[in-house]
C-alpha cells in the first residue's frame, strides 16, 4: 500500500484545497475521502461617530468568548475605505468582535460585538469611534497682602501669591482646527471659541474642545490686580494634544499671574518765600484706615505711622 498527498480544486475559486485520507491498492484503484473546511468571513467597517467619514488604521480582534479573552485572530488594520476582512475556519457558530487599537485622535470603543457566522458567507459589522476632545483650565494668581514687618515708621509689607476670582478670558482658535477625521474643519484661525470668568478658586474650565492649538487672552483683571498693557502680555497659548486611546479627555492648563498696583508718594519741600527746595525736612506717611491682610486680619491700625522720609536736594 502506498500513501500519497492529493490537492483538489473545486474550480469555483472559493476554496482551493481540501485534505483527506486515501490509499492505493495493487489493482491501481484509489479510494479517498475529503473533508472540506467550513470557512466563514467577517468584514468590519470603521467610521467617525459624528461625520461618518471612513477611518483607516483601526485594528480588531475576533474572540471565541464573550469576555474577549481568547483571541482567535487579529484582523488587518482598516484600509482607506475604513474596511477590513478576514476569512477563517468556522469552529463555532458565534464569535465576538472587539477593537484592539484605534486611529490616532480617537477613543477606544470598548464594546464587544456578537457576530453570527455562516459557512461560505460574509458577516458585516459597522463600528464607530468618538474622537478625543479636551478641556482648558485657566488659573488666575496675583499678590495679596499677608503680613507686615518692622517697627512703626519703618514698616515693610509682605505679599504672597493667591487665587483670584473675576478674571475674564477669551479663548480663540490659534490655527485652523479640524475634527480628527482630518476632513471636517470646526474652527478657522482667529475664531472666538469661548469666554470664561474665573471662580472663587481662581480657575475657569472650558467646555469640551477639539484637539488643536488655542490662544487665551485676558480681557479683564480682577480688582486689586493690574492687567498687561499689551496683547502679548495678556496672551498665552495652549495646545490640546492626543492623550492616548484609553483617555477620555485631553487636558491643557495655563496660569496668568498679575502684578498688584503700586503707588509712590513724592513730597517736595520748598521755601515759602523764594521757592527754593529745602533739604532735611522729615515727613511721615500714616494709615488713613485700618490696613488688613487678605484674610481680613488688621495689620496696621488707622493713624499708625507707616514710613518716614527726609527731603533731599
Model-predicted segments: where are they?
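Solvent-exposed loop/turn and edge beta-strand elements of beta-rich ligand-binding domains
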Residues: 1-313
Amino acid at each position: 500500500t502506498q500513501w500519497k498527498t492529493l490537492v483538489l480544486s473545486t474550480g469555483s475559486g472559493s476554496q482551493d484545497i481540501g485534505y483527506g485520507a486515501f490509499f492505493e491498492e495493487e489493482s491501481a484503484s484509489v479510494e479517498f475521502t475529503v473533508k472540506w473546511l467550513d470557512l466563514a468571513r467577517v468584514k468590519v467597517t470603521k467610521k467617525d461617530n459624528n461625520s461618518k467619514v471612513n477611518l483607516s488604521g483601526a485594528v480588531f480582534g475576533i474572540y471565541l468568548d464573550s469576555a474577549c479573552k481568547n483571541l482567535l485572530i487579529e484582523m488587518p488594520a482598516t484600509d482607506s475605505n475604513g474596511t477590513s476582512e478576514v476569512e477563517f475556519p468556522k469552529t463555532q457558530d458565534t464569535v465576538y468582535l472587539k477593537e484592539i487599537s484605534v486611529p490616532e485622535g480617537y477613543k477606544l470603543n470598548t464594546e464587544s460585538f456578537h457576530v453570527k457566522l455562516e459557512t461560505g458567507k460574509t458577516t458585516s459589522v459597522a463600528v464607530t469611534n468618538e474622537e478625543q476632545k479636551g478641556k482648558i483650565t485657566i488659573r488666575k494668581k496675583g499678590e495679596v497682602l499677608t503680613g507686615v514687618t518692622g517697627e512703626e515708621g519703618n514698616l515693610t509689607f509682605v505679599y504672597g501669591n493667591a487665587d483670584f476670582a473675576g478674571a475674564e478670558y477669551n479663548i480663540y482658535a490659534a490655527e485652523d482646527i479640524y475634527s480628527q477625521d482630518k476632513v471636517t474643519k470646526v474652527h478657522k484661525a482667529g475664531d472666538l471659541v469661548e469666554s470664561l470668568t474665573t471662580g472663587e478658586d481662581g480657575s475657569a474650565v472650558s467646555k469640551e474642545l477639539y484637539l488643536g492649538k488655542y490662544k487665551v487672552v485676558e480681557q479683564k483683571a480682577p480688582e486689586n490686580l493690574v492687567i498687561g498693557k499689551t496683547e502679548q502680555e495678556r496672551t498665552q497659548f495652549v495646545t490640546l494634544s492626543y492623550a492616548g486611546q484609553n483617555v477620555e479627555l485631553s487636558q491643557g492648563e495655563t496660569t496668568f499671574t498679575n502684578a498688584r498696583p503700586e503707588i509712590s508718594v513724592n513730597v517736595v519741600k520748598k521755601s515759602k518765600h523764594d521757592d527754593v527746595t529745602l533739604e532735611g525736612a522729615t515727613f511721615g506717611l500714616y494709615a488713613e484706615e485700618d490696613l488688613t491682610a487678605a484674610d481680613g486680619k488688621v495689620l496696621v491700625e488707622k493713624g499708625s505711622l507707616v514710613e518716614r522720609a527726609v527731603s533731599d536736594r
